[in-house]
Amino acid sequence: MDDIKNLIEDLLGGDTVFNNTKILNPEYIPSNLPHRENQIKEMTVSFRDLILNPGSSSIRLVIIGRTGTGKSVTTKKFGLKLREIAHERNLRLEYVHVNCHRQRTLYLILQEISQGLRLQLPNRGLSSQETFRIIYDYLEKRNIHLVITLDEFDYFVSTAPLEDIYFLVRVYDELNVTTKRLHYIFIVREITSLSGLDKSIKDHIIKNIIDFPPYKSTELYDILADRVYNEKAFKENSVSEDVLRFIAEVHGFDKGGSGNARISIETLELAGKIADSENSPIVTLEHAKKANSKINPELSALIDSIKELDLHQLIFLKALVLLHDQEGIDFFPIGKIEQRYVELSKNFGEEPRRHTQIFEYVRRMKLMGLINTRQSGRGMRGRTTLVSLPIPISMEFKDLINTEIRKRLEQSRIS
């Protein structure tokens, strides 16, 4: 008897709590975007001239926010609806969304824009300038306006040569055309990723900024409820409000979570899969708890690593957490963290360690997986080490750091 085959057959042919898992996919664009109405209003105001007075100006818009705050899905939805409204007004408008983390070079970005326009390029290798000229001529001949969203633009800024950034942002304006057909939306996690750019580039980009704050627990609940009850991701009555409330409370920014809608939806989907694996007709609170522990397995490993740190390593980590909480961005220059570390050390009555020792702390904690580091990139002034945390900061994470600091201080006073 083939037990393995029977096991697989049973699961494949068994009942499921899901109705349509596509609705839980990160790339899915829902009908509604709860708690992003204000951002859509701001985007509409920024692009009003494109619809009412097309060609009068080239619009630039920057969208900032942490991972999972709805930046990409809201921008995609806005771009598609703006295109629909323009067509109803007999205005030829196209929208292209480019992920700069996937399309990592200027050449690949221009190729993606061409594909988004369904534009056939010659088989021979083209330079970026030649590709841009073909795109521009295509828009001119067909009287088309184009909105380009450059998602994860901060990644492009940190890796691309300065001349490529300049080309992408400024070349169209240097053509000195009368009718402005190109418009840009830049999506970044933090505005500081642009602040070190050359002034001629930075001033051109940072004009209109729209902030996407982390979601509160009540907002996450509404998002999850929309996917379950309105979009019908799950079968009727298979997911209770208590399950949604639990996930929202765990991840809500006001409750010490990350405010990340993507992780919340992933947790809900995994809870459903666990229910299916147990042949349960409903998703229970226990399924949600199991899913939550699996979604963030790094936390348990980090807890063990944190307990191995000495006092000053813990103070440095606390400095990073405090900066993250206060400024709401992911990466900080090592010098800025060191300044906060010095302040905290003095508050604890400790003599701060020297600069070289701080670098050694960063090196060791990176090897332990407690922090991530990267260089500021060629598009920035100078080069410095940027430091971030590898997981969303929870109250459990903060409490553990504070507890371990207290233990080290007590031990040092006893000895």
Curated annotation (Swiss-Prot):
One of its GO terms (molecular function) is ATP hydrolysis activity. The keyword Phosphoprotein does not apply. ATP binds at T69, G70, K71, S72, V73, Y215, R227. CDD domains: Cdc6_C (cd08768). One of its GO terms (biological process) is DNA replication. SMART domains: Cdc6_C. The keyword Plastid does not apply. SUPFAM superfamilies: P-loop containing nucleoside triphosphate hydrolases (SSF52540), Winged helix' DNA-binding domain (SSF46785). Gene3D superfamilies: 1.10.8.60, P-loop containing nucleotide triphosphate hydrolases (3.40.50.300), Winged helix-like DNA-binding domain superfamily/Winged helix DNA-binding domain (1.10.10.10). Pfam families: AAA_22, Cdc6_C, Cdc6_lid. Keywords: ATP-binding, DNA replication, Nucleotide-binding. It comes from the Archaea. Disulfide bonds: none annotated. Belongs to the CDC6/cdc18 family. Involved in regulation of DNA replication. HAMAP family: ORC1_type_DNA_replic_protein. This is ORC1-type DNA replication protein 2. It comes from Sulfolobus acidocaldarius (strain ATCC 33909 / DSM 639 / JCM 8929 / NBRC 15157 / NCIMB 11770).
